[in-house]
Regions:
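Bacterial N-terminal signal peptides
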Residues: 2-11
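Sec/Tat signal peptide C-region and signal peptidase I cleavage site
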Residues: 12-16
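Conserved functional acidic sites
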Residues: 17-198
Length: 198
């Protein structure tokens, strides 16, 4: 009995899955997203935009995981097709943190070899599992709130720049929106709801 207790204590804390962003394995999970985009080139009206969002766990550590979210098959009637860069998130049991490096692939490999999570910059926190979170960096104001099954990240700037990410428990990303200036350029994508047979 004493040996078992010692082994458990020496093992340290194990990663408990984050309810808002988790994958069962390393296989990509794909979902359809639908929304709108706008820009000065498009004109006054928003136009429909669709995308396939692929979520893949690229690393798993005893203390968390690194998950890549890619935006593929973006389609709209715009002359210039939109590109959305992939996002990498460091996921612990209580945080979702944007990996914001010049070379995210190299950074993901380095972080995945660490014994514990790195120190997180407050402006890179994109999800929480309890309470609320507020952060101000120069003119950018970030709030993260929990509302029922949702974790809502919103960052705004007085110039009109914004970013909104919505996570849903047991699902993952359900909304991604980003805009620059007073409607100079931006998009809003929401996950399509599919009926599930039980």
């Amino acid at each position: 009995m004493a040996m078992t207790t010692i082994a458990i204590l020496l093992a340290g804390p194990a990663y408990a899955a984050n309810p808002f962003l988790d994958t069962p394995n390393d296989k990509p999970i794909s979902a359809k997203f639908r929304g709108t985009e706008w820009s000065e080139d498009i004109g006054d009206k928003d136009i429909p935009l669709t995308a396939r969002v692929v979520t893949t766990r690229v690393a798993k550590m005893p203390w968390g995981a690194i998950i890549k979210i890619e935006y593929t098959d973006l389609k709209s009637s715009a002359e210039k097709q939109r590109e959305i860069r992939p996002d990498y998130f460091i996921v612990t049991d209580n945080r979702i943190v944007l990996l914001n490096e010049e070379d995210n692939d190299a950074a993901a490999k380095k972080i995945s070899a660490m014994d514990k999570p790195p120190e997180f910059e407050p402006n890179d926190i994109y999800g929480i599992t309890s309470g609320t979170f507020e952060h101000q960096e120069v003119l950018w104001k970030t709030t993260i709130k929990l509302k029922g099954e949702l974790c809502i990240y919103e960052a705004t700037h007085p110039s009109g720049h914004f970013r909104k990410i919505v996570w849903k428990k047991g699902v993952g990303l359900v909304e991604n929106a980003s805009g620059y200036g007073a409607r100079a350029d931006g998009y809003r994508l929401k996950r399509e709801v599919t009926s599930q047979k039980r």
